[in-house]
Amino acid sequence: DVDLRISTIPTLYGESVVIRLLERSQIFTDLSALGFPNDVLGEFSAIIAKPHGLVLVTGPTGSGKTTTLYAALSKINDPAKKIITIEDPVEYQLTGVNQIQVKPQIGLTFANGLRSIVRQDPDIIMVGEIRDFETAEIAVQAALTGHLVLSTLHTNDAAGAISRLLEMGVQDYLLASSLLGVAAQRLVRRLCLGCRTQRALDPLSARDSGLQVKNGQSPVTVWEAVGCDECSQTGYVGRIGIFEFLKATPEMCNLIVQHKEAGAIRSLAQTQGTRFLREDGLEKARTGVTTLAEVLRVTR
């Protein structure tokens, strides 16, 4: 089955139409298929298995946030758990999950819907997007009162999600007490294995891109798209995520309570060994999963 999301707008020379294809058979419901590095996959899987707390996935529109949340729900879905989602719109139907679609015309907004959901005795709540203070406040309160809450934000990186919630007006001590972790992501095109080619990168380009010589390898090598019949001459087949994951450690929570800016949070994350978006992307470029150009395109 294929669902279509259609947007039209009148322009000077006629209608501009955008059609988004949602192919149910192609949705990834396995976290390990999304592109998480093994260590990040382990950390992310551990926090979504917790009984309560707030888990956020952040990134721009079209970066795969909803797919990641669906995969997370599929992993923790269990007949003994009551899972309720509120989305705009419901993109895919999940077996065993109570899914609600917002409808502002009748007053069913994220905030009002979430307020009703917490009275339904759920174990796990997924909020499609935190757009305002009211939704953020209810989500945090739900996470503090024994529910696992998963949601998304539109920010450039994981640290920015924390700053955004504080700027919305969420109390710092409540956020520090409820937050489990934040994952940031982008989507890059995956190289066709049938025609990709390897080339040496000159030292200047390697330095500018952030690629370093690894394990005595010299010069740095990357992969490029070519095109063949298998990939319809595009050089790419499908897409894969690049990720960064920020775990809410005690030190991180101290910064939240102090209302520190995203830069300070990012610096602490770096000292704690967090792999940022570009670093994960560069590793995928080095190993031939995608191209250097793709990584730079989505992380600039």
Where are the model-predicted features located?
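Short, flexible helix-loop junctions that flank or precede catalytic/ligand sites
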Residues: D1-R300
